[in-house]
Amino acid sequence: MKVLVLNCGSSSIKYKLYNMDDESVLAQGGVERIGLDNAFIKVKLPNGEKKQIMHDMPDHKEGVNFVFKCLLDPEIGAIKDLKEIDAVGHRVVQGGDKFKESVIVDQSVEDGIEELCDLAPVHNAGHLKGIRAVDSLMPGTPQVCVFDNAFHSTMPDYAYLYAIPYELYEKYHVRRYGFHGTSHRYVSKRVCEILGLDQNNSKIITCHIGNGGSVAAVLNGKVLDTSMGLTPLAGLMMGSRCGDIDASAVTYLMDKLNMKPQEMADFLNKKSGVLGITGISSDMRDIEKAANEGNEKAQLALRMYEYRIKKYIGAYTAAMGGVDAIVFTAGVGENQTDLREDSCKNLEYLGIKINKEVNDKVRGEEAIISTDDSKVKVVVVPTDEEIVIARDTMELVAN
């Protein structure tokens, strides 16, 4: 079975085509700048070479259509006929209370995703455009939605509710949903395989640290708690997002800066985090470089960033009554060695000891970076959200 995985954003489409017989990647790439000037597709060839092709893409339908053309291309493609694609799996950011597991797309699913656009206006609208484009270009091909927050749906009410009048949850569904769920799901299962743990009797803390970041407490294979909230703004300090903040600080600043709600939302999402503290960049590689060169704001941002991660590790260890393993994943977590070390520093009393020599060498590969006598294992696991989506798609379509 061949499964195409799509992640359709507001102006982009990332894709991977899998042969599910052996889970090999047949083709992958991404479309950028849909609806804008200078739109293009980047294709990664099987030999690792990357090819960029400029192409006018006014909307998602043309974006998906051009992905199909590239898949069929004799030089850079991987198939001879679109009928070779048995199913399409989509990443969908917000499933709300409606979707607690992956589903085959039908009209009611499309309607449900549209209803949830209030909670994720940019993301869900992009996903819908992708779903409808595939339906238009490949009618009758089964499509599956895998929801980013579905893995977090096992959170108990005392963990996901906010301490505001209960009727606001009932009426407006205001609660903690969490995000990066497909990543947390993959790495929490994979770390148990690496360490030989029984997932149904395990206490895992997963740290998905990229430009956006979140931590999850996974108890016996199910999420007990996670750091992101109603939106991806809560929790850790991030590239350009503030993370946890006193709600009164927000209303105070709105008054002082004469900001409207959407302006404040943009401010907290796009101009805060390490970018806001340093004024340099939202990219942690730039921040680490500046810190090493003596930039005091960059050094402060790193301390703040690592301190938040450490606080969540401590909090979730308490919430689960202990921890067996801590996982670092995503771009920053997989590649920035100092951040991993400093986030676990002074946690020896919890049984967490980093092997500095091993940790310093590990970038983007599976590895245990704790010492042999560390009671808690610290592990780097590169995430693979696409294979989770492909597996769910195959399973649902096959059944």
Q: Can you annotate each of these PLM segments?
A:
Residues 1-96:
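N-terminal glycine/serine-rich phosphate-binding loop of ATP-dependent small-molecule kinases
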Residues 9, 90-93, 209, 323, ...:
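Glycine-rich beta-strand-to-loop/alpha-helix junction loops that act as flexible
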Residues 70-85, 191-198, 313-324:
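Phosphate/pyrophosphate-binding loops at sites that engage ATP/ADP/AMP, CoA/4′-phosphopantetheine
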Residues 71, 75-123, 144, 151-159:
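Short beta-strand-loop/turn "lid" adjacent to the catalytic site in phosphate-handling enzymes
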Residues 151-255:
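Glycine-rich phosphate-binding loop of actin/hexokinase-like ATP-binding domains
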Residues 219, 225-260, 266, 330-361:
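Catalytic phosphate/nucleotide-handling subdomain of diverse soluble enzymes
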Residues 266, 273-277, 284-319:
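Adenine-nucleotide phosphate-binding core of ATP-dependent small-molecule kinases
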Residues 299, 303-319, 324, 333-399:
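Internal helix-turn-beta structural module
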